[in-house]
């Protein structure tokens, strides 16, 4: 399949990839028609989705199954009056219905807004009114339905609330199993009419409210070409093939889900493995990977921090050939420990809700622990300091040059917010707001957000380097480094630390904070060592699992 969308589909080296990578973008590209329906026609019996849950239930769907289900859902939604450009919010956890549903919405031309089940009624009101959401489709969990019902009176744009079950409250519509599996998709003329119209190209397709590490969520909107841009994510970073069974750990409300559980994987022709769990337990994930013989795996760094504390040798993970991570920087100590046990290097990557994978340790490269890898050639990536290109090992901001061309995968705008769009996208560059340094081999290393850099006694200190040093101590499970006001230094370094299991008693031992400070001094320059250490039970995080340093800073203010 990928040969239809690339001028050259195979590359012998990273240099070959950098020099010859180029997309072939069909006019009015629509992932639903140009990829999914095409697979259904060419290889109808090929496995597309393998879903299982905590109860041991299992579902296996082929590409022909997904086409049939999506057409049935098209028929169901069109009958309700849902049409092109309607905003449809989907709160579906990891339920299998998410996959045919998003394909159906792409066929209709509606804008999909995936959302996490962790939203409160206040969050739902904000989203519905900011985006004029017309329909909410949710899994029938009582807590989710309750929050939606509490929000509903304050959301005048919402016309339909649809539950996929098991709970269907009064005033809601039900999208039943029979609607999905045995609906009218094969005979409904609306389905064939939409196929003839074939929405796509630069029409709006999907929008995310960014979880954000500060401020109210932004509305990041992408067109239909965004799906195609994830081909590189799957084929050359996740390294999936048509024979792969790929697992990405992500709720469907996060942007990570379409990075690793949908677009690129299905363009390549891999099967997507979904473990629909209610409570995250590292041992359960490992058992599922062993049972189903998962071949490639991607998870945020937090998951790896938990995995390396398990007895990984108890599990037969010999099927696992390739592992990746993104979402935030991974501490080298975690990467090294995973390699020592599994003999697999974790291939890191970097991107944002606004982009696809912009930097990655691609499959031809040697992984360097702590490095995000090199620029994806579909983006013109630069590292800038005060308007000039950064030198090797100099910290600069990661920017995407857009003066000559706008790369496939870059967002269209912050929806309904041109001022904010212009703040980050001006003078021919999109500014990510993320800082990094580049070594002499061209590998990038994450430093932090522009706002996270600590300025202490004339030094500029990146929080991630201090966090890396702390994470090499066996007592530290997680940590966040921030600045606090200091009369002499301007700012001082503070570390907020979560202790690992078995070390919790140390939080009440006064000398232990001093031990951690001395440990950091042994690992890096002494001026970077935290002057203040606070022990907590957990760190504040965004709904996608990123540490909210801004919340820690606000407590100090």
Predicted feature descriptions by range:
Residues 103, 107-178, 501:
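Structural core segment of the AMP-binding/adenylate-forming
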Residues 388-423, 461:
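Conserved ATP/PPi-binding loop(s) of AMP-dependent carboxylate-activating enzymes
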Residues 59-64, 198, 205-229:
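Conserved AMP-binding A3 loop
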Residues 44-47, 163, 168-169, 183-209, ...:
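Conserved pre-ATP/AMP-binding loop-to-beta segment of ANL
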Residues 119, 125-126, 136-141, 297, ...:
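AMP-binding/adenylate-forming catalytic core of the ANL superfamily
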Residues 45, 49-103, 120-125, 176, ...:
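Conserved AMP-binding/adenylate-forming core of the ANL superfamily
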Residues 267, 294-298, 308-368, 380, ...:
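Gly/Ser/Thr-rich phosphate-binding loop
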Residues 228-248, 252-295, 310:
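Conserved AMP-binding/adenylation subdomain of ANL enzymes
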């Amino acid at each position: 399949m990928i040969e239809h969308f690339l001028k050259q589909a195979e590359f012998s080296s990273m240099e070959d990839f950098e020099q010859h990578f180029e997309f072939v973008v069909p006019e009015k590209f629509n992932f639903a028609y140009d990829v999914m329906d095409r697979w259904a026609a060419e290889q109808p019996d090929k496995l597309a989705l393998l879903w299982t849950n905590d109860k041991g239930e299992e579902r296996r769907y082929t590409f022909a199954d997904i086409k049939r289900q999506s057409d049935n859902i098209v028929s169901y939604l069109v009958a309700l009056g849902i049409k092109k450009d309607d905003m449809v919010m989907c709160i579906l956890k990891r339920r299998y219905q998410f996959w045919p549903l998003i394909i159906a919405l792409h066929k209709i031309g509606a804008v999909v807004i995936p959302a996490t089940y962790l939203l409160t009624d206040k969050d739902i009101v904000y989203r519905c009114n900011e985006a004029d959401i017309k329909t909410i489709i949710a899994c029938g969990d009582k807590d989710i339905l309750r929050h939606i019902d509490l929000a509903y009176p304050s959301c005048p744009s919402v016309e339909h609330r649809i539950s996929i079950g098991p709970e269907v409250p009064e005033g809601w519509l039900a999208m039943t199993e029979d609607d999905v599996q045995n609906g009218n998709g094969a005979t409904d003329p609306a389905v064939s009419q939409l196929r003839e119209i074939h929405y796509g190209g630069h029409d709006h397709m999907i929008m995310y409210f960014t979880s954000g590490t500060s401020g109210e969520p932004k509305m990041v909107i992408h067109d239909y070409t965004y799906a195609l841009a994830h081909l590189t994510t799957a084929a050359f970073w996740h390294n999936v093939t048509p024979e792969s069974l790929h697992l990405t750990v992500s709720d469907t409300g996060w942007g990570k889900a379409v990075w690793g559980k949908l677009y690129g994987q299905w363009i390549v022709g891999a099967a997507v493995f979904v473990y629909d769990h209610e409570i995250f337990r590292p041992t359960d994930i490992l058992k599922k990977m062993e049972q189903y013989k998962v071949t490639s795996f991607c998870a945020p760094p937090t998951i790896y921090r938990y995995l390396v504390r398990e007895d990984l040798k108890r599990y037969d993970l010999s099927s696992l050939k390739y592992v990746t991570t993104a979402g935030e920087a991974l501490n080298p100590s975690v990467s090294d420990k995973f390699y020592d046990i599994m003999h697999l290097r974790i291939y890191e990557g970097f991107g944002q809700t606004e982009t696809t994978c912009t930097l990655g340790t691609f499959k031809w490269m040697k992984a360097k622990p702590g490095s995000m890898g090199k620029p994806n050639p579909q983006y013109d990536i630069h590292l800038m300091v005060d308007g000039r290109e950064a030198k090797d090992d100099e910290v600069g901001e990661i920017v995407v040059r857009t003066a000559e061309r706008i790369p496939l995968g870059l967002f269209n705008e912050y929806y309904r917010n041109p001022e904010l769009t212009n703040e980050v996208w001006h003078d021919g560059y999109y500014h990510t707001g993320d800082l990094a340094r580049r070594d002499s081999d061209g590998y990038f290393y994450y430093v932090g957000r522009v706002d996270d850099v600590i300025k202490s006694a004339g030094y500029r200190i990146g929080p991630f380097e201090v966090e890396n040093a702390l994470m090499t101590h066996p007592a530290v499970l997680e940590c966040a480094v921030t600045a606090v006001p200091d009369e002499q230094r301007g700012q001082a370094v503070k570390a907020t630390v979560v202790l690992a299991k078995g070390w919790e008693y140390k939080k009440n031992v006064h000398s232990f904070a001093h031990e951690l400070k001395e440990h950091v001094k042994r690992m890096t320059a002494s001026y970077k060592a935290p002057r203040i250490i606070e022990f907590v039970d957990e760190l504040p995080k965004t709904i996608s699992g990123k540490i909210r340093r801004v919340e820690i800073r606000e407590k100090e203010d």
